[in-house]
Each structure stands twice: as C-alpha cells, then as structure tokens.
A protein has these predicted regions:
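Short, charged, intrinsically disordered terminal tails
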Residues: 5, 96-113
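Short beta-strand-centered aromatic/proline hotspots
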Residues: 20-22, 70-78
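SH3/SH3-like beta-barrel fold
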Residues: 31-33, 82-86
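A short macromolecule-binding patch
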Residues: 42-43, 90-100
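Acidic, aromatic-enriched beta-alpha/helix-loop junctions
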Residues: 28-63
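Short, hydrophobic/aromatic-rich segments at coil-to-beta transitions
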Residues: 2-10, 58-64, 82-83
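Residue-level signal for glycine
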Residues: 15, 37-38, 106
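Short N-terminal "domain-start" leader segments
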Residues: 1-23, 113
C-alpha cells in the first residue's frame, strides 16, 4: 500500500516529511500520522496536528522495535515499504537478518519498551 491520497504531508523546515495529516477518516477531527503510517491521537485544529507530528518527529525511528519475537531496528523506509534488521549497526561485518514490511507498519512491528 502507498500513502493514501487524503493524507496531507507535513515536513520539517528542511523539507523532510515527518508524517501526514489525515483530514478524511475522522472528519471533522484531524489525525496526525507518524512516519511509519501509524495514527496519533485525533485533534480538532490543524496547528495541534502539526505540533503532534513535530513532537513525534523522526527520532523514534532510531529506537528498537519488536518483529516476530526479534529485536530489530529500522534500516530504511519509504512510502511503500519498511526494511528492518536484526543487525545492531550498519557496520560491514554486522549482517543480521533483514525483513521487508509493507507500509504503513502493522501491529507486528512494535516499539520496544
């Protein structure tokens, strides 16, 4: 799946998209959508949706996640897929297993506590 047409991109000052604002699903409320395609709490005002996305940002993508009982990290993502790996780093010898997931991320990819 790709980014739905009714998701409006929200970018940082440098132009990097950090999420979207869904104006359709919960209208008249707005749903901020993070970079993994996951909904945040609905809000009623556009500035509140932008603020929620700014707070969430991209930093959370550096966290560890759980996938199929494995600890993984996000290696790359775009508007069509998410690549996760069990490798601890991108060092040459640190191979690990890679998994390609559909975008948006489903519940099988969970943030580690």
């Amino acid at each position: 799946m790709a980014v739905p047409d009714h998701w409006i991109p929200h970018a940082r000052e440098d132009g990097e998209v950090i999420g979207w604002i869904d104006m359709h699903t919960a209208a008249p409320d707005l749903i901020p959508i993070d970079r993994l395609g996951r909904p945040l709490s609905a809000v009623s005002e556009w500035p509140d949706a932008e603020e929620a996305l700014e707070r969430r940002g991209l930093r959370f993508l550096m966290n560890r996640f759980r996938f199929e009982e494995r600890t993984v990290r996000i290696r790359s993502l775009d508007d069509h897929r998410i690549v996760v790996t069990t490798a601890a780093s991108d060092a040459v010898g640190d191979v690990g297993e890679e998994f390609v997931l559909d975008f948006p991320a489903g519940p099988e990819l969970a943030e580690s506590p």
